[in-house]
């Protein structure tokens, strides 16, 4: 694997930490099944560029928190043409990062990348809980003839038997998605966007306590979720 220099990578760090806590940023600008506007392939580059304007000093902890972990940023790879092949490619990259005892932080790209990431984790942990912050359920079994479409991302994650999902902010889904959701009460819990004022975060904590958990954050959820999560 090839890495960017600390100054050109995520956050533009002035120096490397000597901490044993290791994080690896994986830029993966996938754009294969977008159904509205294009440009997801430029996401990782834009995030990394914007991150260079972030203050490194943490005003809550009153310290340079970035020194508490070693952060590497992978050099972007050439993504394979077929969607399924691209997901296998990403799964392989995440697996190599996990084998280096690093925590992977993946920047997309359209959100069909999720099952590729989860495949790598599912092989290394007995059970995983995904925290999904999203406006869409993404539980379709396929969309526009594509099984691995962005609209099917969470459905494909549930193809792995050791995966559970806790979702926040969902406000868009079709009837087939809702029918499927009703069949998996032990594997998925949705905190609906319409019920945001009544969300019980103690219930949420119980759902993920003592579990291996990963987060999937989709920007279209932020308008309805961000303030509520911050206040909680």
Provide a role label for each language-model segment.
Residues 2-232:
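Conserved alpha-helical scaffold segments that buttress catalytic/binding sites
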């Amino acid at each position: 694997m090839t890495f960017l220099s600390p100054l050109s990578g995520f956050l533009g760090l002035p120096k490397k930490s000597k901490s044993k806590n290791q994080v690896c940023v994986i830029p993966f600008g996938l754009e294969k099944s977008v159904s509205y506007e294009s440009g997801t392939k430029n996401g990782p580059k834009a995030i990394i560029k914007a991150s260079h304007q972030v203050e490194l000093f943490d005003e809550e902890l009153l310290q340079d928190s970035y020194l508490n972990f070693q952060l590497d940023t992978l050099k972007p790879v050439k993504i394979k043409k077929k969607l399924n092949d691209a997901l296998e490619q990403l799964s392989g990259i995440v697996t190599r990062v996990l084998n280096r005892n690093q925590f992977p932080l993946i920047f997309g790209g359209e959100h069909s990348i999720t099952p590729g990431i989860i495949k790598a984790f599912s092989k290394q942990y007995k059970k995983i809980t995904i925290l999904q912050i999203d406006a869409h359920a993404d539980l379709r079994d396929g969309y526009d003839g594509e099984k691995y479409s962005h609209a099917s991302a969470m459905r494909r994650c549930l193809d792995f038997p050791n995966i559970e999902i806790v979702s926040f902010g969902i406000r868009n889904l079709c009837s087939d998605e809702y029918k499927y959701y009703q069949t998996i009460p032990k594997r998925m819990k949705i905190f609906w966007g319409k019920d945001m004022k009544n969300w019980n975060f103690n219930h949420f904590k119980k759902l993920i306590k003592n579990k291996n958990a990963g987060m999937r954050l989709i920007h279209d959820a932020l308008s309805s979720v961000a303030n509520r999560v911050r206040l909680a």
